[in-house]
């Protein structure tokens, strides 16, 4: 690959290179069409001088493999990576947003509520990375992407390395931006994940003040400030606008001694939230809810659309001028053209046009009405969880995505259950129902919970689980014991009436999602990050890997009364069945299914599946070759599904913050 002559129009393996988006010291970024899947992607091609370096290839392969398994919502996943004709590549999605650096440069400091809301999301991304042995090493505003609805992503994990294998990174290399580098980065002391916490505290301070933590006229003086000077006090720099309690949060996050910092990025985020005034806490929560719902609506794009003039809702002193470019020569991100939200016949039409210029977060702080989540302008940006920093500036274009509307009027047989307390950050995720008709839901968030709605009740109960981190799958057995997976890579159980939870002895889980329990008490887990399904028999301390083959991001698992196991093989767009006590795997004849997610099976062997992208629930009768769509209405990103003995179907309607049931 030449650094001077782009390869636009040429073929790179299965990729047709459509447009050069950016060029950096290590390679180029292209808008490309994956001709196998007929979708537009972001493709990073690493230059020959690095692709030919065995040490570099080993490092990038290790980092891409590790970071590519990070499924935390605030980390952008990669589709694929590898080598073609000796050249290393990384394929990623295109998402919408602008860098935090651009927002701060154009509009100045954020409100405390918005600053904390963004930092809480980045903290969740860091905690997920740290739990997998990955340190980012370059947390800064340039590497934080914020959408028009304030959903935040941490990008550019290309300089990150697996903490357990330092041999792949040269010792002593100063990687990152000096403004956000922890003191130990300059002294040769051991650098741990807490360097990321220091950087996040620096970012929080800059969000509150509009300036990096230390001002210096030389690199040497800047390093000395990190080593010797006290942390800045935002409340002194912006008196009356920043709560003084945030000064202590910044000070602890930027402690010179790593051991004196917060134990986790999440702890820093919680402390920052607690330091806000009550009014600001409500504003921050509103921002988080809106960002989650809007992002769940915006499905990763597959095809291109015509461009139109666009602006983005920013932060600070005023709205941007419609049509103005938002990327400046400091932004380490690449803006690409807009893509369709769903090209497979989903009910998310797209069209060109403008939306209100007033920032959503600013509206929240002023108490004005917030426009519908669908009325958002889009700036399509290329980011990657395992990509190197490639700086590029291009003009942005956008379009409107109309949110599927739904009416409080229920379809025949459809009912919204009276759950409360699940409308915060990616909720609900899992759903289960016991033999008595009690319904359980995981309220997914940075620190989540399990909520129970008793039969006939209009009030909910929070079960006494503790320490759950983004709980996912949920199941309940005949005795009323509740099982839940979370992103601590574990399965936790709570017996009926007990306050003492138990962690089951599963080993090596990597982002477990779906969960099921059979009539014998055996527990099944869709171990998404490892592309497998594991089983733990009742009373056993040793798990078994079930002999499924070719799984790609399995999300849901179910088991019937005969012991047959069913899995939604999400990225392969199929549902597979493993017959009891055999190696016989069968692909079920669901019709044109896309992104299957949740799965359940009733006593008659009918299989129910949610389609994540098309907002449908489909069922396949035992022995049938034709699936049918259930008459749910207004679903928005349905995830888990459950069915009771009366064949009433329950769905976690995540994008609408509700649980819906449909009677047979």
From Swiss-Prot:
Q: Name one GO cellular component term.
A: peptidoglycan-based cell wall
Q: Which GO terms describe its molecular function?
A: ATP binding; manganese ion binding; protein kinase activity; protein serine kinase activity; protein serine/threonine kinase activity
User: Where is this chain's protein located in or outside the cell?
Assistant: Cell membrane
Regarding how it is modified after translation, the entry says: Autophosphorylated. Dephosphorylated by PstP.
Q: Which UniProt keywords apply?
A: Acetylation, ATP-binding, Cell membrane, Kinase, Membrane, Nucleotide-binding, Phosphoprotein, Repeat, Serine/threonine-protein kinase, Transferase, Transmembrane, Transmembrane helix, Virulence
Does the entry annotate any disulfide bonds, and if so which pairs? none
N-acetylserine PTM positions read: 2
**Annotated spans, Disordered:** 303-333
Which GO terms are recorded in the biological process aspect for this UniProt protein? cellular response to phosphate starvation; negative regulation of fatty acid biosynthetic process
Positions contributing to ATP binding: 21-29, 44
How this chain sits in the membrane, per its record, is:
Single-pass membrane protein
**Domain Protein kinase span(s) in chain numbering:** 15-276
Q: What mutagenesis or variant effect is reported for residue 79 to A?
A: Lack of activity
* Top-level taxon of the source organism: Bacteria
> Top-level EC class, please?
transferase
Which residues are annotated as modified residue Phosphothreonine in the UniProt record?
135, 169, 171, 173, 209
Q: What is its EC number?
A: 2.7.11.1
Residue spans, topological domain Extracellular: 403-664
User: Where, by residue number, is the active site?
Assistant: 138
Q: Which InterPro entries match?
A: 6-blade_b-propeller_TolB-like (IPR011042), Kinase-like_dom_sf (IPR011009), NHL_PKND (IPR035016), NHL_repeat (IPR001258), Prot_kinase_dom (IPR000719), Protein_kinase_ATP_BS (IPR017441), Ser/Thr_kinase_AS (IPR008271)
Assembly behavior: Homodimer.
Q: What does this protein do?
A: Part of a signaling pathway that enables adaptation to osmotic stress through cell wall remodeling and virulence factor production. Phosphorylates the osmosensory protein OprA, which inhibits binding of OprA to Rv2638, leading to the regulation of osmotically regulated genes, including the ESX-1-associated virulence factor espA. In addition, directly phosphorylates the alternative sigma factor SigF and its regulator, Rv1364c, which regulates the SigF-Rv1364c interaction. Can also phosphorylate the FHA domain of Rv1747.
What protein family is recorded? Belongs to the protein kinase superfamily. Ser/Thr protein kinase family.
The name of this protein is: Serine/threonine-protein kinase PknD
């Amino acid at each position: 690959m030449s650094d001077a002559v782009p390869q636009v129009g040429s073929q790179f393996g299965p990729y047709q290179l459509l447009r050069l988006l950016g060029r950096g010291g290590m390679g180029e970024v292209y808008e490309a069409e994956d001709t196998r899947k007929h979708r537009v992607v972001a493709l990073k091609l690493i230059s020959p001088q690095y692709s030919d370096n065995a040490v570099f290839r080993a490092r990038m392969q290790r980092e891409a493999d590790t970071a590519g398994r990070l499924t935390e919502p605030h980390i952008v996943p990669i589709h694929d990576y590898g080598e073609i004709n000796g050249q290393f590549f990384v394929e990623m999605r295109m998402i919408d947003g602008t860098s935090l650096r651009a927002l701060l440069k154009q509009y100045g400091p954020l409100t405390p509520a918005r600053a904390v809301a963004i930092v809480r999301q980045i903290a969740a991304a860091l905690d997920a990375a740290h739990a997998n042995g990955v340190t980012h090493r370059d947390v800064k505003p340039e590497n934080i992407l914020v959408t028009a609805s304030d959903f935040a992503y941490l990008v550019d994990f290309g300089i990150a390395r697996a903490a357990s294998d330092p041999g792949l990174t040269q010792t002593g290399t100063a990687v990152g931006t000096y403004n956000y580098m922890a003191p130990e980065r300059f002294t040769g002391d051991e650098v741990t994940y807490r360097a990321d916490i220091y950087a996040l505290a620096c970012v929080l301070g800059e969000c509150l003040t509009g300036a990096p933590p230390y001002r210096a006229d030389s690199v040497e003086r800047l390093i000395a400030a990190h080593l010797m000077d006290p942390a800045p006090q935002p409340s002194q720099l912006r008196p009356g606008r920043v709560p003084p309690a945030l000064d202590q949060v910044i000070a602890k996050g930027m402690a010179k001694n790593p051991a004196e910092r917060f134990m986790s990025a999440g702890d820093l985020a919680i402390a920052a939230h607690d330091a806000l005034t009550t009014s600001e806490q409500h504003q921050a929560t509103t921002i988080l809810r809106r960002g989650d719902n809007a992002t769940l609506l915006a499905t990763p794009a597959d095809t291109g659309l015509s461009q139109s003039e666009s602006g983005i809702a920013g932060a600070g002193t005023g709205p941007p001028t419609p049509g103005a470019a938002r990327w400046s020569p400091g932004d380490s991100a690449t803006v690409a053209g807009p893509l369709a939200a769903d090209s497979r016949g989903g009910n998310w039409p797209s069209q060109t046009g403008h939306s209100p210029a007033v920032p959503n977060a600013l509206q929240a702080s002023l108490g004005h009405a917030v426009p519908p989540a669908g009325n958002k302008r889009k700036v399509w940006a290329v980011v990657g969880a395992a990509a190197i920093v490639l700086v590029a500036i291009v003009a942005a274009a956008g379009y409107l995505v109309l949110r599927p509307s739904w009416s409080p009027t229920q379809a025949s047989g459809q009912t919204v259950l009276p759950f409360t307390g699940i409308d915060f950050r990616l909720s609900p995720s899992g759903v289960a129902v016991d033999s008595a008709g009690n319904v359980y839901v995981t309220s997914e968030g940075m620190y989540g919970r399990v909520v129970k709605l008793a039969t006939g009740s209009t009030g909910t109960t929070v079960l006494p689980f503790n320490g759950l981190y983004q709980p996912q799958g949920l199941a309940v057995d005949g005795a009323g014991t509740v099982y839940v997976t979370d992103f601590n890579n574990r399965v936790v159980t709570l017996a009926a009436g007990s306050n003492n939870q138990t962690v089951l002895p599963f080993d090596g889980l990597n982002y477990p999602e779906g969960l099921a329990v059979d009539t014998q008490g055996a527990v099944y887990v869709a171990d998404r990050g490892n592309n497998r399904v594991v089983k733990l028999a009742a009373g056993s301390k040793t798990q078994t890997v079930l002999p499924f083959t070719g799984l790609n991001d399995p999300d849901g698992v179910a088991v019937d009364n005969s012991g047959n196991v069913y899995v939604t093989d999400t990225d392969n767009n199929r549902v597979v069945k493993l017959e009891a006590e055999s190696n016989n795997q069968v692909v079920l004849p669901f019709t044109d299914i896309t992104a299957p997610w949740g799965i359940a099976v009733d006593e008659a062997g009918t299989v129910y599946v949610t389609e994540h992208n098309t907002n449908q629930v489909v069922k396949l009768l035992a022995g049938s070759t034709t699936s049918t769509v259930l008459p749910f209405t207004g679903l928005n990103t349905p995830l888990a599904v459950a069915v009771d003995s009366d064949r009433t179907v329950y769905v976690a309607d995540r994008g609408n913050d509700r649980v819906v049931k449909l009677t047979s």
